[in-house]
């Protein structure tokens, strides 16, 4: 999700306040007053289309419930839901990152997820308010050109990237919201003032190598146009698959355990309070963290980590159980507003 799209969420939240004074809908996985045996669920999805389509197909086959998917950037969809308020046609909202869901939850637009569904994933990867569930995860990593840098030369901390030694060698894609959790983590650990100075430093070091998206960033690192950048893990794996192993001149590596640059990003889903198909929406949420959908995530080329039902990580990824990220929580990541404000102040948005 682009930073401009998340800003739309925050702007839309002002207008949404007047639209969310609606009665709560009590739902269970067994049914509800807003259900139909022939219902067609409307899914607003900001997740990878390939993964979502595979999961939807499996859900339809298993349940007989049809799903109509509207695919777009999660920021665009979140802003639209806020504008639509209680009249939104969406039944379920699925995202790549937690801040978009937190924004909707903060305005009372999501209903509670069934306890039995939430129990399928660790509580730390789902909404503190229990109104959305964690479905999959990614981890922020270093990507570096292996012809120009040895692994032993890599920074141990994301803070080191502001040092003069990386001037002209660093790549950034600051408008990608995958970068914002790192900014939030830096601010949470070191304070906003130091986070601002760090952003000024990396902006200076990345001058001439600031890209519009992570795909461009990882491509430029791989081609040797720039030495190092910070991305979510799956961008490197997808580049490897795209260009073929013989043309890979880069690698991914983690920051030191617990570093603010070593962050878990959670992709999740929630059901809308305004859904006219409450029971079916809850069934879909349960399916997302059940074994069938989680195995699809584990084997899919999106290279994400499954979070539910004890499904193991895909073979190419560092095992999820061995990751040692910054302890920042989804609650602390919030709506992403802290990161957005800092990035704006640093002229990176």
Enumerate the predicted regions with their spans:
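Short, low-complexity disordered leader/linker segments with a strong preference
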Residues: 1-40, 349
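Early extracytoplasmic/lumenal segment of secretory-pathway proteins
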Residues: 28, 35-103, 349
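Short amphipathic alpha-helical coupling segments at ligand-binding clamshell hinges
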Residues: 55, 194-198, 267, 276-288, ...
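A bilobed periplasmic-binding-protein/Venus flytrap-type ligand-binding module shared by bacterial periplasmic
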Residues: 141-148, 264-277, 296
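Extracytoplasmic/periplasmic substrate-binding proteins
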Residues: 211-274, 309-316
């Amino acid at each position: 999700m682009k930073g401009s799209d998340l800003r739309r969420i925050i702007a839309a939240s002002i207008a949404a306040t007047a639209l969310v004074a609606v009665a709560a809908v009590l739902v269970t996985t067994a049914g509800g007053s807003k259900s139909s045996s022939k219902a067609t669920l409307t899914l607003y999805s900001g997740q990878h289309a390939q993964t979502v389509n595979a999961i939807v197909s499996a859900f339809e086959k298993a349940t007989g419930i049809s799903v109509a998917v509207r695919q777009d950037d999660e920021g665009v969809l979140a802003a639209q839901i806020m504008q639509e308020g209680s009249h939104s046609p969406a039944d379920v909202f699925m995202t790549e990152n937690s801040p978009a869901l937190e924004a909707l939850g903060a305005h009372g637009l999501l209903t509670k997820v069934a306890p039995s569904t939430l129990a399928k994933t660790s509580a730390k990867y789902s909404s503190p308010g229990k109104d959305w569930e964690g479905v999959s995860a990614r981890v922020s990593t270093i990507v570096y050109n292996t012809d120009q840098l040895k692994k032993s030369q890599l920074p141990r901390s994301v803070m080191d990237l502001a040092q003069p030694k990386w001037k002209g060698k660093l790549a950034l894609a600051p408008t990608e919201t995958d970068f914002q959790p790192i900014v939030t983590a830096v601010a949470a650990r070191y304070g906003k003032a130091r986070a601002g100075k760090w952003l000024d430093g990396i902006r200076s070091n990345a001058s001439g190598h600031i890209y519009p998206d992570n795909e461009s960033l990882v491509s430029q690192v791989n081609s040797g146009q720039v030495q190092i950048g910070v991305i979510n893990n799956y961008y490197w794996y997808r580049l490897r698959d795209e260009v073929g192993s013989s043309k890979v001149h880069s690698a991914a590596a983690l920051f030191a355990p617990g570093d603010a640059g070593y962050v878990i990003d959670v992709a999740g889903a929630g059901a809308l309070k305004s859904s006219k198909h409450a029971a079916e929406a809850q069934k879909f949420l349960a399916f997302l963290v059940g074994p069938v959908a989680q195995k699809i995530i584990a084997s899919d080329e999106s290279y994400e980590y499954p979070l539910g039902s004890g499904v193991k990580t895909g073979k190419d990824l560092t095992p999820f159980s061995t990751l040692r990220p910054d302890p920042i929580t989804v609650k602390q990541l919030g709506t992403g507003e802290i990161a957005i404000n800092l990035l704006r102040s640093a002229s990176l948005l």
